[in-house]
Each structure stands twice: as C-alpha cells, then as structure tokens.
C-alpha cells in the first residue's frame, strides 16, 4: 500500500510506516496529479484540494483529512469515482473551546467586560459549539444557541433564531461548517444585514471558516463602532488575509484555534484508525503528544491559570508582526497542551 501524507501532520510517521509499504511526505500545497497517480490513499489537511483535477485517473481509493472540516474535498466527485473519504469530527473541539475561553478572559482583563453579566450567542452547536457552551456556562455567561439543522431535526425549543442572537447577545461566536449553497448555506452568514442588526458594542468571534463572515461587512462594523472588538482565527482568502482587519481585531491568529497537541493527536489517530478500517489492517499503535515542560500551574485565580496554559495573544502578536508568514506560523506551531495535561493549584 502506498500512502501520500501531508508532511505537517504530527505524530504520524512511526505509525504510518508500520502500516504502509511506501509513504511519501509532501507539503499540503504540493499534492499533484502525478504524485498521487499510483497512490492507494491520501492523508491530508485543509490545504490540499481533492477534486477531479487532482484525482482523475489515479489509483486512490481512500482519503483521510486530519481536520474537522471537509470543504476541501469534492465529495460529489469522490462518490462518482468510488473514493471513500473521512474527516475527524470533534478531534480538536476541546482545543477550540480552550482558545475561546482564553479569549473571553482577555476581553475581561483588557476591556473590563464582566463575563457573568454577558450573554453569548453560539452559532453552530456541534462538537465544538457544545464544548464552547459548556465553557461559557462554567464562567457564568448566559448562553443562547443557534443551529438551524439541529433545530429542525430535533424539533427543539432550545434554539434561538440568528436574528434574536444578533439583537440580544454581547458576544457571538461561530462554529459552523462552510456550506456555499443549499438550505443551510453558511457562506457569508454574517453579512452587512447581520451586522446592522447587532446589539451595539458586541464582540464577534470566528474559529470556523473565514468565508462564514463577509470581510468588508465585518470591517465596516468595526469602523463604525457597531462592533467593539473581534477575535478572528479564520479568514477569507487564507493565507492572503486582509491586513486592515488584522490590525483592527483584538486577537488575530493564523487558523490555529484547534492546534493543541491534544487535538492534533486526536486527528492523526482518527485518520489512521479510518485508514486501517478501510484496508482491514490491525494495529494497536497509540499516539500521545509530548508532555509540557512545566506541568504544575500554581496561581491566584483560574483565569490566570488558563492564560498561563494558553494565551492567544502570543499567536496574535506573531501574526500581526509577520502577516506574510501565515502558513509558516501554522506549519511550525509550537507545542500547546490542553488543561488536562497540567496540575492546577489555585492559591487564593
């Protein structure tokens, strides 16, 4: 079995080399029709577009993307060509929730927001959105949920309309997949009409897909004061991001909200397990990320502990200083562990 692997997928080399006869590692942008021609499987990230132009005439039978999102895979073509594909749903949901929690603490520290007096609207309540809701409730924030597909499927009254969330929420965070058309279209879900309906002084957060928010409408809302702040991890036209938007946001990061070592290990494990199931290979290889250098966090408050474990301002400062290095900052992302890897002692 021959497998082509994105060379930035962590913790995969030893495991995949026990499974496959031949493994080739390349940057995600360098997958070509010639390269995949005689491959049996691909393990990719979002930077590799898997469609007819890449796959036509190849031997590829299976594609695993080590990501939650799969809009970079032409699923209709794969179905037509008999190619099985899989993603890694929920792999980095705790990582994104960690990012959002830290961002909320930063807003409280630097903007004087009292989180226990705020209302947050969570748009998209899947694996990630559900964990973000848990975090918000733990911090004493009132939560409103919006998820049209779930609302219709479950016939539930727990969900609010997007209009209601826009009018009532102090903070709105997006956790939806990108659908460019159809009944549940999310492309430019936050457009100028959405921003004009917002509660004045609201904060927007986006860790889903850049195209969910219309960039020019977001910029105008920031310029006019409709929005007080924005936390942006995903951007339209990545890696060629809007520099004015980067300058205006309180936190702007290079699509790394889900990049904890724990989330990456989950994604790699899920991709390998799916590969083994498809090709009927037995393996018991375990993937564990490296331990943090200092496992003991001792400080006066949980807020301080959370920001000692992960402070997104470090990633934001790096991107604002070097916006042209978007891809490099993603690809060379340093070790970041989630809260469960530490022993936290609150001394106050």
Swiss-Prot record:
Alphabetical GO biological process terms: pyridoxine biosynthetic process
Pfam family, one: DUF3410
SUPFAM superfamilies reported in the protein's UniProt record: Formate/glycerate dehydrogenase catalytic domain-like, NAD(P)-binding Rossmann-fold domains
EC number: 1.1.1.290
Active site location: 209, 238, 255
PROSITE patterns: D_2_HYDROXYACID_DH_3
Reactions catalysed: 4-phospho-D-erythronate + NAD(+) = (R)-3-hydroxy-2-oxo-4-phosphooxybutanoate + NADH + H(+)
Annotated family: Belongs to the D-isomer specific 2-hydroxyacid dehydrogenase family. PdxB subfamily.
Quaternary structure note: Homodimer.
Protein's name in the database: Erythronate-4-phosphate dehydrogenase
Species assigned in the record: Bacteroides fragilis (strain ATCC 25285 / DSM 2151 / CCUG 4856 / JCM 11019 / LMG 10263 / NCTC 9343 / Onslow / VPI 2553 / EN-2)
The encoding gene: pdxB
């Amino acid at each position: 079995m021959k497998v082509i692997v994105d060379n930035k997928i962590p913790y995969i080399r030893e495991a995949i080399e026990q499974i496959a006869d031949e493994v080739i590692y390349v940057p995600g942008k360098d997958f070509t029709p010639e390269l995949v021609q005689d491959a049996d499987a691909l393990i990719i990230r979002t930077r590799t577009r898997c469609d007819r132009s890449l796959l036509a005439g190849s031997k590829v039978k299976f594609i695993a993307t080590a990501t939650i999102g799969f809009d970079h895979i032409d699923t209709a073509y794969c179905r037509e060509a008999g190619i099985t594909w899989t993603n890694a749903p929920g792999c980095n949901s705790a990582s994104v929730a960690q990012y959002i929690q830290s961002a909320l603490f930063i807003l409280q520290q630097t903007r004087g927001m009292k989180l226990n007096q705020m209302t947050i609207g969570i748009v998209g309540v899947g694996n990630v959105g559900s964990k973000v809701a848990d975090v918000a409730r733990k911090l004493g924030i009132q939560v409103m949920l919006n998820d049209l597909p779930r609302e219709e499927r479950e016939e539930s009254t727990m969900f609010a309309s997007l209009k209601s969330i826009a009018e009532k929420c102090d903070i709105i965070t997006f956790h939806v997949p990108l659908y460019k058309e159809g009944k549940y279209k999310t492309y430019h879900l936050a457009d100028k009409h959405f921003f004009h309906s917002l509660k004045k002084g609201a904060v927007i957060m986006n860790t889903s897909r850049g195209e969910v928010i219309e960039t020019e409408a977001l910029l105008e809302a920031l310029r006019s004061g409709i929005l007080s702040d924005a936390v942006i991890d995903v951007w339209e036209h990545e890696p060629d991001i809007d520099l004015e938007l980067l300058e205006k946001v309180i936190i702007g990061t290079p699509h790394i909200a889900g990049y904890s070592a724990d989330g990456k290990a989950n994604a790699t494990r899920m991709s390998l397990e799916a590969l083994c199931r498809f090709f009927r290979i037995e393996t018991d290889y375990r993937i564990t990320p490296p331990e943090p250098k200092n496992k003991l966090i001792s400080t006066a408050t949980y807020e301080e502990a959370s920001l000692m474990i992960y402070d997104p301002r470090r990633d934001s400062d790096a991107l604002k200083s070097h916006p042209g290095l978007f891809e490099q900052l993603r690809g060379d992302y340093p070790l970041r562990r989630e809260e469960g890897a530490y022993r936290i002692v609150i001394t106050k």
